[in-house]
Amino acid sequence: MPIISKVVARQILDSRGNPTVEVDVYTESSFGRAAVPSGASTGVHEAVELRDGDASVYLGKGVLKAVENVNTVISDALEGMLVTEQEEIDEMLLALDGTPNKSNLGANALLGVSLACARAGAEYTGLPLYRYIGGTMANTLPVPMMNVLNGGAHADNTVDFQEFMIMPAGFTSFSDALRAGAEIFHSLKALLKSKGLSTAVGDEGGFAPNLRSNEEAIELVIEAIGKAGYKVGSPTDKGGLGDAQVMIALDPASSEFYDAAKKRYVFKKSSKQELTSTEMAEYWERWVNTYPIISIEDGMAEDDWEGWKLLTDKVGSRVQLVGDDLFVTNSIRLADGINRKVANSILIKVNQIGTLTETLQAINLARLNGYTSVISHRSGETEDSTIAQIAVATNAGQIKTGSMSRSDRMAKYNELLRIEEELGSQARYPGKAAFRV
């Protein structure tokens, strides 16, 4: 019987050198391990990541309280349960915590246990994790959303918007799409060098040069795509699609430069201009009409519902509008957004909600209502590749897991290459069909 015999947590370090939680789950015949990521720009509605707060140790970012919660309260409750009963395990975790935002035991404690149990369950059944979670129809490799140029909270430069990304959707296999992404990344590096700009990389592996404007950033990415020999879409195409091989995606992380007191979007790092919600929506409409943009994540602030509705009405039929801080992988907030008819896609970050079951519920709710799902990493990552498995398990069709550098990002891409090889002729790369615009 796959009975949980031991649950052990420890404090390890993430890709930014900050502590995070790693959990091991044992049964008599299987083992599972999971490490928990953390974000830099976090939404106020996310589940609570429990930190120790002792400034003398890891600058207050230690996670020994969360580790202790796993090794005592959670371990005592889970030992003796069947590791293959994922929903029951996650229900137990939620009951043990007893708060709506996981602030008692910590979402980082709960998530580590939840994912480690899934890993142990998959090993017990002899199935790869994507098959264990998704069943026999799990065969879709995701279109990568590659963060090649950084600004905002991810970089010390004069660019307000956090992420400028490429999406190589015009290919027939994940491996070919990944190759194109890597070639464009190196093309961009050479282009930056030729202009005397920095090629240092940010938390997610993208470049963070000191540019004059947000416009210069997107124009550099478009130029790099062309220099790599690939066709980028035209803004006259629907969403920049047409016969394009590569499209542009943005994550401005608008909550980071929204002044709630003024009710203005303040471009603090570049022009210093201040925009109302209406003006911000019009700004994005101009960009969509000018550049080959297929996806905008967090184009408006997390609680600016009016702004989100304006943006959705203006460009939602042409562009994927992804809610990250808006929805925080939370089915309740997603349902609210669906009822308000805002956005058309949800970013899925497992640590925003805290358990695998709740993550899958959010993905299913999105699918039932015609919203796409983008499985995502965090800026503070580990070598754990579970999100790659989840992307295939759910046939989500899109993954956001950084640029073409830093081994914590490459771990996910390499895992997807292995899965594609394992699936063989069953592997499906959705390409432009990943978008519903």
Swiss-Prot record:
One of its GO terms (biological process) is glycolytic process. Its cofactor is Mg(2+). Mg(2+) binds at residues 251, 297, 324. InterPro entries: Enolase, Enolase-like_C_sf, Enolase-like_N, Enolase_C, Enolase_CS, Enolase_N. Pathway: Carbohydrate degradation; glycolysis; pyruvate from D-glyceraldehyde 3-phosphate: step 4/5. The active site is at residues 204, 349. It is found in: Cytoplasm; Secreted; Cell surface. Signal peptide: none annotated. Catalyzes the reversible conversion of 2-phosphoglycerate (2-PG) into phosphoenolpyruvate (PEP). It is essential for the degradation of carbohydrates via glycolysis. Belongs to the enolase family. This is Enolase. The lineage of its organism: Bacteria, Pseudomonadati, Chlorobiota, Chlorobiia, Chlorobiales.
